């Protein structure tokens, strides 16, 4: 799952994947993987606390993408999320930026995110 988080200026919060991970160095929308027994929404709330030190409400699902990379298949569920409380800061030593929608296409995102990015611009 991944969160589409916008600030009051309409910018999206993105984070950079750490070195040593699948697609290292690329930008992405914050999120992660579901643990057994979690709903997608519960997992996304947990991941956002773990990654960003803040709580968010999970809103509508915007898109689901299934993408086949040479080494694995991923299914991504993108949700609109709204900040609730805390201080947004990256806890997993990753870079974080607020980016205008028009700039998203200029940055290096995983191929699975491209269709969504085209919709957000």
Where are these regions (language model features)?
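Hydrophobic packing within well-folded, soluble alpha/beta domains
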Residues: 3, 14, 43-48, 61, ...
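A conserved beta-turn-beta hairpin within the catalytic core of GNAT-like acetyltransferases
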Residues: 22-26
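Short hydrophobic/aromatic beta-strand or adjacent loop that forms the aromatic wall/cage
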Residues: 2, 74-78, 113
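The catalytic Nudix box helix
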Residues: 29-61, 100
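Conserved N-terminal beta-strand and adjoining loop/helix that marks the start
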Residues: 1-12, 33
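Active-site-adjacent beta-strand/loop module that shapes the phosphate/pyrophosphate-binding cleft
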Residues: 7, 55-57, 64-88, 95-97, ...
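Charged phosphate-binding loop/patch that engages nucleotide di/tri-phosphates or the phosphate backbone
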Residues: 112-121
């Amino acid at each position: 799952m991944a969160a589409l988080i916008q600030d009051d200026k309409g910018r999206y919060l993105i984070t950079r994947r750490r070195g040593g991970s699948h697609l290292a160095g690329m930008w992405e929308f914050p999120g992660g993987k579901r643990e057994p027994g979690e709903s997608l929404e519960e997992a996304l709330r947990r991941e956002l606390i773990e990654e960003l030190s803040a709580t968010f409400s999970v809103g509508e699902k915007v898109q689901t993408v299934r993408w086949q990379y040479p080494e694995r298949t991923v299914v991504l569920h993108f949700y609109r999320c709204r900040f609730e409380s805390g201080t947004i800061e990256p806890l997993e030593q990753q870079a974080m930026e607020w980016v205008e929608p028009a700039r998203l296409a200029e940055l290096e995102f995983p191929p699975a995110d491209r269709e969504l990015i085209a919709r957000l611009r």
